[in-house]
Amino acid sequence: MPLNEPSSNAFPRTVLFDLDGTLLDSAPDMLATANAMLAARGRAPITLAQLRPVISIGTFRILAVAFPELDAAAIQGLIPEFLQRYEALIGSVSKPFDGVEMMLDALECAGTVWGIVTNKPEFLARLILPLLGWTSRCAVLIGGDTLAERKPHPLPLLTAAERIGVMPTDCVYVGDDVSDIQAARAAGMPSMVALWGYRSHEDNPMTWQADTLVEQPHLLSRPDVWPST
């Protein structure tokens, strides 16, 4: 899919990223967690192909794929077990997408400040940062339970910008799900769709009204790809 026409020849002052499906390929750890729960119940495992399209949506949808026969209340009741098992496995298989480290290095060399705004529980996201060597590099981390609202509400993005000390219009938000783009638009923040992320076949990012679509992380090492801020 072609990129939208870029409108800037400079890196943004600040970049905020989604985590799962944007910076981190966390699908293997989440698959291992779901399959451990299934094995504990004598059930057959699910596949990565089944799980990938729903990872950006959240734990509830992951469990709905693993346990399709359960109603919403029963699935909700499994979430604490999933989070406990996932905490034990976190970072064991997951790694940044190819090109992410190159991109982050390029941003930092240009003086760009970057942070993470994710719907993953904050304590889990914070466990990941030291495993990747990102603790001192990430200027702000907002999780799905950090505030009273989560994406697609704009509050997490607005709070991240405030904590860094910049205006929302000085930031670009990069994510792989429609809720990421909705949050950015509501916050008045330029946005980019990470096309390498966890989209389902039914998703059409061309309809999300992002400023830019980008195919691979390494392309974000180029200043001309970024939308203007």
Swiss-Prot record:
EC identifiers of the protein: 3.1.3.18
Residue numbers binding Mg(2+): 18, 20, 176
Biological process terms in GO annotation: carbohydrate metabolic process; DNA repair; glycolate biosynthetic process
Family per similarity comment: Belongs to the HAD-like hydrolase superfamily. CbbY/CbbZ/Gph/YieH family.
Keywords: Carbohydrate metabolism, Hydrolase, Magnesium, Metal-binding
Active-site residues (renumbered): 18
Gene behind the chain: gph
Known cofactor(s): Mg(2+)
Superkingdom per UniProt: Bacteria
Organism of derivation: Xylella fastidiosa (strain 9a5c)
Protein name: Phosphoglycolate phosphatase
Top-rank EC class of the record's enzyme: hydrolase
Keyword Acyltransferase: no
GO CC, alphabetical: cytosol
